[in-house]
Amino acid sequence: MHPEPSEPATGGAAELDCAQEPGVEESAGDHGSAGRGGCKEEINDPKEICVGSSDTSYHSQQKQSGDNGSGGHFAHPREDREDRGPRMTKSSLQKLCKQHKLYITPALNDTLYLHFKGFDRIENLEEYTGLRCLWLQSNGIQKIENLEAQTELRCLFLQMNLLRKIENLEPLQKLDALNLSNNYIKTIENLSCLPVLNTLQMAHNHLETVEDIQHLQECLRLCVLDLSHNKLSDPEILSILESMPDLRVLNLMGNPVIRQIPNYRRTVTVRLKHLTYLDDRPVFPKDRACAEAWARGGYAAEKEERQQWESRERKKITDSIEALAMIKQRAEERKRQRESQERGEMTSSDDGENVPASAEGKEEPPGDRETRQKMELFVKESFEAKDELCPEKPSGEEPPVEAKREDGGPEPEGTLPAETLLLSSPVEVKGEDGDGEPEGTLPAEAPPPPPPVEVKGEDGDQEPEGTLPAETLLLSPPVKVKGEDGDREPEGTLPAEAPPPPPLGAAREEPTPQAVATEGVFVTELDGTRTEDLETIRLETKETFCIDDLPDLEDDDETGKSLEDQNMCFPKIEVISSLSDDSDPELDYTSLPVLENLPTDTLSNIFAVSKDTSKAARVPFTDIFKKEAKRDLEIRKQDTKSPRPLIQELSDEDPSGQLLMPPTCQRDAAPLTSSGDRDSDFLAASSPVPTESAATPPETCVGVAQPSQALPTWDLTAFPAPKAS
């Protein structure tokens, strides 16, 4: 195939043999039918042209030249090729459309990129009727022509060409932007035919005088004008620019006229009333106001106007900040109102529940109130559990531990097992109101008790302030808790524990208690003047203590450990299930867990069974109860066939009317590995067995652990397993 006219031939021989083709096409373009027939002959037999002998090629060239009447035109085809640039042919335009992924059909394209192609002439654009943007910059175009078919054109880019005159733009009635920068234009002309021309760029041309730009007065719609880097030097050009009603953007940089106009920016801003952008920066309203003030009164007026503008700007900023602060303040007020409403609702709901914290009527802090409520709940549940576990005793019996009221009214009596106290003496709980409180008898197995300790509180509606925690009362005198108000909840006895753990929940330091000797007992009293500084201490135990942690009282000198180094725990009760269904259902319970959290748990948390059987327990005064223990063992051996409960009621009495001492649990001689070790942690403190008969009251095999010599234990494996209830 023959090469395109715009593509240079490559190869030495091929270039010499086929050099006549450009001449053929050119003649065809210049001479219609004759050249067109010659071209068809060459196309039909290309091999003869390119492969044939040099004589045949020469004759063909002579024949073409004879037909065209130009005798020496093809004598030097390579030189002619170098003189002329690429042409804007239809085939080359189609190739460019394909290269830029445009439509092959010319009329469908609205944009055509013909920049940087080296074209020197605008031609063959008749079929591109739908063009809206035509890029022709950076070519060698010398004349604006052949644009009659581009009636829809909006943007025409002809910068960086060889144009010397503005012409042939009449068909472009919809042209909006025209770029003629970097050309050789000396006069602006022939633009009045463009009714909607908005942007004209004439930078880097040869405009010099006022007459060269005088035609701009006829461009009434021109808004953006770029005349930078020309040779304009006459200040009278401002009169031409003033006559342009819609001029908004003006660029005069690079012209000598800038140096010829005094106060150039102020002057241009004042004279061009609608100018918003001058040269390289905008014209702000403040700049225009200052320029107008300068035109009226000079620099002083300009300074005053500038200060006014600055004050207005500062005031505007201040107003904005104040508005934001007001919005924030209103939001905070609404938040405070919501919070106050919520607090008011909470206060109204708590008015009936709040109790004064002191005798003076001061309100109790929230933490103290919560502690007091938990302590009252604990004491109440303690007495309820005592009433459920202990039956009433017949009247007339004098219990060693009593709970009395100061009004002396009749009170029901009840008993608690001896396991509720650990190495402590009877505890007396007294109140001042007239309500009858249940009177409980708490037998003790420990040696003779020391004097009791009494803790008084001055507020009847709350727990006595300055209450000492149970951990500080190990082997201490009994605690007497007295109330002075009739609204006082029933209070119970708190077992004593070792002193090492600090009191939990204490918020302030307690005042030093005073020991007062009254009636042969030691009473701990608190200074009444500092009652408001006292605080009820929550009796909480974070750790679970076992019976193995009890101190060895008799071996204290041998071991060298003080009682303060031993960790004590609350007494625990283990109840062995009955042998048959004849046992008392009220006493047929498994075990009571250890007291872990006084404010929240019930009295059942006081008692628990230790899982550690590493140490052997023993009870002092074994010689005293040895006889009764042997008798109990004989009775059990004689009456093994008769099933009966293992726990005896504490209310049983001796016929003489005196309370019998509890027997010890005699173990077999053979040591037990499992049940024996587990039961060795406790020894029962219960009533003696009355008679040897089948209908004997239940016996007990529950005891309080004492650090002493190991004792023989019962063989608990001989009893059958308890039946499921």
From Swiss-Prot:
Cilium-specific protein required for the stability of the ciliary architecture. Plays a role in cytoplasmic preassembly of dynein arms. Involved in regulation of microtubule-based cilia and actin-based brush border microvilli. It is found in: Cell projection, Cilium; Cytoplasm; Cytoplasm, Cytoskeleton, Spindle pole. The modification Phosphothreonine is found at T559. Residues 1-91, 330-513, 632-703 are annotated as: Disordered. Residues 38-48, 76-86, 330-345, 360-408, 481-491, 632-642 have a biased composition (Basic and acidic residues). LRR repeats lie at residues 107-129, 130-151, 152-173, 174-195, 196-217, 221-242. It is linked to Ciliary dyskinesia, primary, 13: A disorder characterized by abnormalities of motile cilia. Respiratory infections leading to chronic inflammation and bronchiectasis are recurrent, due to defects in the respiratory cilia; reduced fertility is often observed in male patients due to abnormalities of sperm tails. Half of the patients exhibit randomization of left-right body asymmetry and situs inversus, due to dysfunction of monocilia at the embryonic node. Primary ciliary dyskinesia associated with situs inversus is referred to as Kartagener syndrome. The gene is DNAAF1. One of its GO terms (molecular function) is dynein complex binding. One of its GO terms (cellular component) is cytoplasm. InterPro entries: Cilia_flagella_integrity, Leu-rich_rpt, LRR_dom_sf. Residues 256-294 form the LRRCT domain. Belongs to the DNAAF1 family. Residues 53-67 have a biased composition (Polar residues). Disulfide bonds: none annotated. GO terms for biological process: axonemal dynein complex assembly; axoneme assembly; cilium assembly; cilium movement; determination of digestive tract left/right asymmetry; determination of liver left/right asymmetry; determination of pancreatic left/right asymmetry; epithelial cilium movement involved in determination of left/right asymmetry. Its main location: other. This is Dynein axonemal assembly factor 1.
